Each structure stands twice: as C-alpha cells, then as structure tokens.
Amino acid sequence: GGIFKTANKEHLSIDEIKCEVKNSYFLTGSFVKGDGQGHAEPSEINLEIRSTEEKSKIAELINKYSEKSPVLNALRTPLKNTFSLTANGRRKKLNNLNESKKNDAEDPYQFYTKQPSPNEKENFSDRMILKTGKVSEGTIEPVDGYNVSASSGNVPGNENFNKIIRTIVGNSTTKANDKIVEVDTVLGLPGMSHFIISMDIDGIKAPSPVNVMGAAISFCFLTQTHRYIQHQKFQIEGLRMSQYATFEKNSLSPLTMLPLDTHLFVNGTASDEDNERLIDMSERTCYLHATLTKCLIPKINFEIIN
C-alpha cells in the first residue's frame, strides 16, 4: 500500500505488487526454567512488481518508501524499551527494568466503561483478522523445549543444541486501486493454520500497518505473561496493559521510533519481586520485544514483471 501511494506521488505506474515477508525468530534457554531469551533475525521482503517502469526508478521508489516507513524504521532502530507496573492500583518502582516516565498511562479497566464492541455506524472491513481454514501440508511435530548451548555459563548445555528457527511467512497480492491489503500469514511449519490480516494504509476501513504492528507486539507480550503466570504459579490476576508506540520526525532526519512504552496493570497477592520478574521474563521471551532491541536491517529483494 505504501509503495503504491509513493508511486502515485512520483507519477510512476505500477499495476500489481506481490509481496512475501519472512520474519524469523529463535529461542535460547528454557521457558520452563525461566531463563529463555528470544532472538530475531532481519526480515526478508521479496517483491514481485508488475510495471513498465525502468528498474532503476522502481529501485529508487522502494528505497524512498523504505526510508519513511514507520515499521521498517522500527526494525532498524535499537531501542531501550520502558515499562511501568501498577499492582492493586498502586504504581510500583522497578529495580531491574527501564522505568517509564509516563505517569498518566490509561488502565483499560478505567478507560473502557463497557466491553469494547465494533462500531456499527462505520463501514469497516469484516476481514481484519480471519482464520481461513487453510492448513499447511504435513504433520505437526514436537520440538525440544530446552535449547541451551554448551557455553551458556552455569546453565547445563543441551548436547543436541541447534538454533531452532521459527519463520512467520506473509503473502499478499495488491493491485493499484485496492484500498485494503490482505496478508495470508502462517507459521512456516507443517500442519499450521493460515490467517488473513487486513490493513489499510490510511487506517480507515482496517487498521494501518503501524496499528497492526502495535497489536502484534501487545499480543506477543501478553501471551508470554499469561504463560508465565500459569507456569510459575504467580498469584496474579486481572492482567491488562497499555502500550504507547511513538515516532519522531523532523526535517533533518528520517522517521525514527522512540522506545516502546509498556504499562502493566495487575491485581493479586504476588510480591513486588514476582510482579517485576513476570515483566522481565515476558520481555526476554517476547520475540517482538527482542526485534525492537536490535538493529535489524530488512533485506529487500525485488523483480520487475512487464
């Protein structure tokens, strides 16, 4: 969507773009032992562009959009993300994490006076996220859950250590007049379910790509917190979160992302130490937080189809 929009401004003709995106992640350590560490590799973006324009012009176009894309800039910018913890209505001091300076983060329990529901007055896409029913060929196979190298300090190593990479694959085909980009996304393993995620570059009929990125980070982080609460038997309930992704732009530099600001709200009888430990472990195993802490230059490949 962004490339089409930029092409229109540059008076360049593009009929169709097929896009494949591969995001690869791996885990070292053990989720069970609580020493897991998520890692990310640079995204691979493969474009097949149907156009009669010269290849050099398309290359320049892609480079221009890459420089101003909020999502791609987030991948290129290493961030020291910030956090806050509010337990039973009281803000707690964090000892081992970067403390957020924001003092007015919204508690979802107070922000939403009633359960959120779709806006019936607006013509939104009914395919924002959809399980398609398609399943990748093959049979689901279990993996080794303890992935520690023999050189991991005092932690016993796994003699059969290997970097088990999980790749998320997204494919889309977008034509010049399309208002919404639909991405078929799947975990690149046998037997996995396919989903459709829809985006509107203007954020009108569906979330914008930046909105989708924010939702993905939130979902990934909260998934880890719920897993750890259950596995570690933390006395924590009523988990909710507010997250702020801020971008900075000025005339002297391209768009840059500022540290992701995450605010966790909990109830329960868990100690302050357990509450902070929950955030710490969840951040370390969240693949998307791992993505944001590194400078990961996307690999963009393209070919022109006449």
Regions inferred by a protein language model and the residue ranges of each:
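Extended beta-strand/beta-hairpin segments
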Residues: 5-215, 225-306
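Alpha-helical metal-binding/catalytic segments enriched in His/Glu/Asp
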Residues: 1, 220-221
